[in-house]
């Protein structure tokens, strides 16, 4: 039997790294999410502000994988908080490159905010749990995320 091409093997390896039970999806405007992995979708409902708090088991960190966003900067954006609601805002994002962020604890919060009259632009964010210990791959740090805030009020 002939083996698959190297690119196919790489694709299968990548799929294995991100595999999981993706039946946990949140299309609601906010809430507390547990038991990763999961996927957050924004809502086009009447709510202007949505807050999702992700809590994973103790001795784990929350990892957020954010594909490139295409939000209307100045009218809508996503805030990342390193901890529960009320924690320090570590970044505001409305567009740009993909980001992967690892929280400093087992809690992270995502806020989606938009101005009145602004229709919600679709986006999604993946969340995972990562055990405490050395980083397994590079994550964006606070300074990198702040650099994406230039056009956000």
UniProtKB/Swiss-Prot annotation:
The modification N-acetylalanine is found at residue 21. Disulfide bonds join 29-50, 73-94. Residues 93-130 are annotated as: Heparin-binding. Coiled coil: none annotated. InterPro entries: CUB_dom (IPR000859), Sperma_CUB_dom_sf (IPR035914), Spermadhesin (IPR000124). Keywords: Acetylation, Disulfide bond, Fertilization, Heparin-binding, Secreted, Signal. Partial N-acetylation differentiates isoforms AWN-1 (not acetylated) and AWN-2 (acetylated). GO terms for molecular function: heparin binding. Residues 29-130 form the CUB domain. GO terms for cellular component: extracellular region. GO terms for biological process: single fertilization. Residues 1-20 form the signal peptide. It is found in: Secreted. AWN proteins mediate the binding of boar spermatozoa to component(s) of the egg's zona pellucida by a carbohydrate-binding mechanism. Awn proteins are secretory components of the male accessory glands being coated to the sperm surface at the time of ejaculation. They possess as well heparin-, serine-protease-inhibitor-binding capability. This is Carbohydrate-binding protein AWN. It comes from Sus scrofa.
